[in-house]
UniProtKB/Swiss-Prot annotation:
Allows the formation of correctly charged Asn-tRNA(Asn) or Gln-tRNA(Gln) through the transamidation of misacylated Asp-tRNA(Asn) or Glu-tRNA(Gln) in organisms which lack either or both of asparaginyl-tRNA or glutaminyl-tRNA synthetases. The reaction takes place in the presence of glutamine and ATP through an activated phospho-Asp-tRNA(Asn) or phospho-Glu-tRNA(Gln). Belongs to the GatB/GatE family. GatB subfamily. GO terms for biological process: glutaminyl-tRNAGln biosynthesis via transamidation; translation. This is Aspartyl/glutamyl-tRNA(Asn/Gln) amidotransferase subunit B. SMART domains: GatB_Yqey. Its EC number is 6.3.5.-. PANTHER family: GLUTAMYL-TRNA GLN AMIDOTRANSFERASE SUBUNIT B MITOCHONDRIAL AND PROKARYOTIC PET112-RELATED, GLUTAMYL-TRNA(GLN) AMIDOTRANSFERASE SUBUNIT B, MITOCHONDRIAL. Keywords: ATP-binding, Ligase, Nucleotide-binding, Protein biosynthesis. It comes from the Bacteria. InterPro entries: Asn/Gln-tRNA_amidoTrfase_suB/E, Asn/Gln-tRNA_Trfase_suB/E_cat, Asn/Gln_amidotransferase, Asn/Gln_tRNA_amidoTrase-B-like, GatB, GatB_C_1, GatB_Yqey_C_2, Gln-tRNA_amidoTrfase_suB_CS. One of its GO terms (molecular function) is ATP binding. Heterotrimer of A, B and C subunits. PROSITE patterns: GATB.
Length: 476
C-alpha cells in the first residue's frame, strides 16, 4: 500500500519591535541573563499588562502579506500551564478570536506547478523564557519572556517534507521583506514545529499525528519530517497503534525522540484575559498598514525575470533576502549586464559570504564597485579569472576594482604577437602534448592553454590563448 504524508506547520516569528508585547523592556538579543525584565514580564503580583500597538500593526501587516482576512474585533486569552520558563504560570495569547484568519502561501513544485498552502490563523502571543540545563541544575533566563511573537498556523495541505521546506522558505522571505521579523533561525527568532501523520494515497481520513519540535533549520525540518514519515509508515504497515504525542528532533542521532503525550486544548484551560480590553481594528488602520507593505519577494522575482531577462531560478534565489535583491538591482542598473551580475552574486560572492559568515549588508564594497568589476571584464581589461582575484581583494579592503588592477598590474594582455611567442615556446617544450593531440586527445590542448596562462601569470586573454594554441597545434 502506498502512503502519503499530511503535514501542517506552526511557525513562531519574533517581531522586530523595540520593546516587549506588554511592557517597556527591551527586546534586544544577547543581554546578560535576567537584565531585560520588569514586574510585568515576570508576572509579579499587582502588575498590569499594556498591549504594544506596534505588535498589532505588525500582526496586521503579516496577515495582509499572507493573504489573510483581518479580524476587526479580537481579544487576548490566557493559556494556563506550569513550566519554569513561564513566570506567570500562564501565557497571554489568542485562542478563539485571533488577529488573522484564512490566508495562503503559494509555492512552486519541482514540476513547475504552483500549489497553495492554506494558513488557518495568525495569532499574537508572548514568548517564554529560556532554560539552560547544566550538570548542577537548570537555570532560567527571563530576558526573552514577553518578547512579542506571531504564530502562523498552516492548514494540513503539505504532502512532502520538500513542500514543507519550500513553504517555510517562502514564509521567511515574506516576513523578512516586510520587516516584521529578522527571521534569524540561529538566534531563535524564527522557530518551526511540525505536525505529521500518514494516510493511504487517495484517502481523505488523516492518521494519528505527531508534533515535532527542535527543527531549527531548513535541513533539520526536512530530515525530521522524512524520518517521522518513515516511522509512521513502518508502524502502520506492521499494524501497530500510533498515539498522538510530542517528539523532538535529535540532530546528533538523526532521530525523533518522545517528549510527552500530546496535550489537548482543554488541558490549557483557555479563558479571556481580563486585564486587557477587546481589540477593535478599524478599516482605516488596516488600509494605513497595507500602504506600508513593499513589493513582496515573489512579485520582485517576477519583475526581475520580465525586466532584466534573467532565469526564473536566478530571480528566486536573488529575492530570498531583500538586501540581496536590492544589491542585484542597483548593480545591474550600473553594469548593464544582469546575467553577469546574477552570476557573481549567486556564485563567488555568496561563496565568500558563507565562508566568512557575513551578510550582504556587511560587504565592504557597494553595487557601483561590483558594476565596475563587471565592466572591466566585459571590456577585456581583465580576464574573468583575474576578476575573481580582484573580488577577493575587494572583500578584504573595500577598494575599487580599478585601483586594485592598477596597483597590482593586473591589466589583461591582449597583444596577439606577444602571446603567440609564449604559445610557440610552450608547444616547443611540450612535444608529447602535441603528439597526444594528434592521437585524438583533445584535452592535451587544455593542458597547453593552462601552461600559457601560468607563464603569463594569468594576464593573457584566455580567448586569444585558446585560439592561438589551437591554430599552432593544428599546424604541427
Amino acid at each position: 500500500m502506498d502512503f502519503e504524508a499530511v503535514i501542517g506547520l506552526e511557525v513562531h516569528a519574533e517581531l522586530s519591535t523595540n520593546t516587549k508585547i506588554y511592557c517597556g523592556c527591551t527586546t534586544e538579543f544577547g543581554g546578560q541573563p535576567n537584565t531585560h525584565v520588569c514586574p510585568i514580564c515576570l508576572g509579579l503580583p499587582g502588575s498590569l499588562p499594556q498591549l504594544n500597538k506596534r505588535v498589532v500593526e505588525y500582526g496586521i501587516k503579516a496577515g495582509l502579506a499572507l493573504n489573510c482576512s483581518i479580524n476587526k474585533v479580537c481579544r487576548m486569552d490566557r493559556k494556563n500551564y506550569f513550566y519554569p520558563d513561564c513566570p506567570k504560570n500562564y501565557q497571554i495569547t489568542q485562542d478563539e478570536v485571533p488577529i488573522c484568519r484564512d490566508g495562503y502561501i503559494e509555492i512552486e513544485l519541482e514540476n513547475g506547478e504552483k500549489k497553495k498552502i492554506g494558513i488557518e490563523r495568525i495569532h499574537m502571543e508572548e514568548d517564554a523564557g529560556k532554560l539552560l540545563h547544566t550538570n548542577a541544575g537548570t537555570l532560567v533566563d527571563y530576558n526573552r519572556a514577553g518578547v512579542p511573537l506571531i504564530e502562523i498556523v498552516s492548514r494540513p495541505d503539505i504532502r512532502t517534507p520538500e513542500e514543507a521546506t519550500k513553504y517555510l522558505e517562502k514564509l521567511k522571505s515574506i516576513l523578512s521583506s516586510i520587516e516584521v521579523s529578522d527571521c534569524k533561525m540561529e538566534q531563535g527568532s524564527l522557530r518551526c514545529d511540525g505536525n505529521i501523520s500518514v494516510m493511504p494515497k487517495g484517502s481523505e481520513k488523516f492518521g494519528v499525528r505527531s508534533e515535532i519540535k527542535n527543527m531549527n533549520s531548513f535541513k533539520a525540518l526536512e530530515k525530521a519530517l522524512s524520518y517521522e514519515y518513515d516511522r509512521h509508515v513502518e508502524a502502520v504497515t506492521k499494524g501497530e497503534i500510533l498515539e498522538q504525542e510530542t517528539r523532538r528532533w535529535d540532530e546528533a542521532n538523526s532521530v525523533t525522540v518522545l517528549m510527552r503525550s500530546k496535550e489537548k486544548a482543554n488541558d490549557y484551560r483557555y479563558f479571556p484575559e481580563g486585564d486587557l480590553v477587546t481589540l477593535n481594528i478599524s478599516d482605516e488602520w488596516i488600509e494605513e498598514v497595507r500602504k506600508t507593505i513593499p513589493e513582496l519577494p515573489h512579485e520582485k522575482a517576477e519583475r526581475f525575470v520580465n525586466e532584466f531577462r534573467i532565469p526564473k531560478y536566478d530571480a528566486m534565489v536573488l529575492t530570498l533576502t531583500m538586501d540581496m535583491a536590492k544589491f542585484f538591482e542597483e548593480t545591474t542598473l550600473k553594469s548593464e549586464d544582469a546575467k553577469a551580475t546574477s552570476n557573481w552574486l549567486m556564485g563567488d560572492i555568496s561563496r565568500l559570504m558563507n565562508e566568512k559568515t557575513i551578510e550582504v549588508k556587511d560587504l565592504k564594497f557597494n553595487p557601483e564597485q561590483l558594476a565596475e568589476l563587471i565592466k572591466l571584464i566585459n571590456a577585456g581589461t581583465i580576464s574573468n579569472n583575474i576578476g575573481k582575484k580582484v573580488l577577493d581583494d575587494m572583500f578584504k579592503s573595500g577598494k575599487s576594482p580599478k585601483d586594485i588592477v592598477e596597483e597590482k598590474g593586473l591589466v589583461q594582455n591582449n597583444d596577439e604577437g606577444a602571446i603567440l611567442e609564449v604559445v610557440k615556446k610552450i608547444i616547443e617544450n611540450n612535444p608529447q602534448s602535441i603528439e597526444d593531440f594528434k592521437n585524438g586527445k583533445k584535452r592535451a590542448l587544455g593542458f597547453l592553454v593552462g601552461l600559457v596562462m601560468k607563464e603569463t601569470k594569468g594576464k593573457a586573454n584566455p580567448q586569444i590563448v585558446n585560439k592561438l594554441v589551437s591554430e599552432e597545434a593544428n599546424k604541427m
